[in-house]
């Protein structure tokens, strides 16, 4: 079975490192992390992920702009993007952040793995 590729873009390096190590430990995923949103699009092109977890609020460029770059790239246009954010409540809908699914921070590992499973099964 091929490992699914997960790309985590978040300026909180401790969070991305922990998530990467935990997901890779399962043996099911190959994980790439990036803490600089300005590098995310090019890294995504190289890595060709199945799912991108993308923080909305980052220095230099926000997740919404990164998502637009990814969506406008024919190579990446169909990749699942899931926003990670602390700026919305758990009761808001995905339409409140541009129609993308999201997980509200702080997010549990269980919520991340459930989200991965659901989106890879779709």
Residue spans for each PLM region:
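Active-site residues of response regulator receiver
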Residues: 10, 55
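Two-component/phosphorelay signaling modules centered on CheY-like receiver
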Residues: 13-32
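Conserved Asp/Asn-Gly motif in the active-site loop of CheY-like receiver
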Residues: 34-38
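Active-site beta3 strand of CheY-like receiver
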Residues: 47-53
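Receiver (REC) domain active-site loop signature in two-component systems and cognate sites
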Residues: 58
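Hydrophobic/aromatic residues positioned on beta-strands within the core alpha/beta folds
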Residues: 82-84
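C-terminal output helix
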Residues: 107-118
């Amino acid at each position: 079975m091929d490992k699914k590729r997960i790309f985590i873009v978040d300026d909180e390096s401790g969070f991305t490192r922990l998530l990467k190590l935990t997901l890779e430990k399962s043996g099911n995923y190959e994980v790439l992390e990036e803490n600089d949103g300005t590098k995310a699009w090019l890294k995504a092109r190289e890595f060709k992920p199945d799912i991108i977890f993308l923080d909305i609020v980052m220095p230099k460029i926000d997740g919404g702009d990164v998502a637009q770059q990814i969506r406008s790239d024919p190579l990446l246009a169909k990749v699942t993007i899931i926003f990670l954010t602390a700026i919305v409540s758990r009761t808001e809908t995905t339409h409140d952040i541009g129609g993308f699914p999201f997980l509200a921070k702080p997010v549990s590992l269980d919520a991340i793995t459930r989200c991965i499973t659901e989106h890879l099964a779709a």
